[in-house]
Structure formats: C-alpha cells, structure tokens
C-alpha cells in the first residue's frame, strides 16, 4: 500500500505512524514545503521517502494535512494528479 502524506506535522505524522504500525508493509511518502520537516520525518522513520505531487499518480491513499486555507489550493492539484481509485483524506485543522 502506497500512502502519501502532504504536510508532515502533528496530525499527518500521527496518522501515518498509526498506518505504519497497523500495516508495516505500507510505504509512506512525504510531501512538505518545509524541507527540514521532511528530512526530520525521514530520519525519525515517520515517512519512508520524500515525494512530489507528480508522484501522487502511484498513490493508494493521500492524506492532506495542511491548514484549511492551504488545502483550498492543494486539493485541486492533488485531484488532478491522482488515479481514479485513489482515496483522499483531508484532515486539516482550524486553530
């Protein structure tokens, strides 16, 4: 199972850690505008490797975990990039 998380913060990171514990055969890909967050997530084993929006065509699941105002811009890009059987979760929070 190929899971992509866009926005590797508390919510997105927590979700993929749970997915990894329940489905250890999953491969977790991370997309984040903050390169240091992405590098830290890889070093900590939260995600397996970095990805780009173009890579979303391979996704089984996409978790969009960005602030709601950013999600409005990101979701159209995600929907244009994914396959017809990909499941997308939007889990942004309003603070």
Identify the residue ranges that each predicted region occupies.
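NAD(P)+-binding Rossmann beta1-loop-alpha1 motif at the extreme N-terminus of oxidoreductases
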Residues: 1-53
């Amino acid at each position: 199972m190929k899971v992509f998380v866009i926005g590797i913060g508390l919510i997105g990171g927590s979700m993929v850690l749970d997915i990894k514990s329940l489905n250890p055969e999953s491969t977790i890909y991370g997309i984040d505008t903050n390169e240091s967050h992405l590098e830290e997530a890889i070093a900590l084993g939260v995600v397996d490797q970095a990805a780009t929006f173009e890579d979303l065509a391979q996704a089984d699941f996409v978790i969009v975990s960005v602030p709601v105002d950013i999600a409005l811009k990101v979701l159209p890009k995600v929907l244009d990039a994914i396959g017809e059987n990909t499941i997308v979760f939007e889990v942004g929070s309003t603070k």
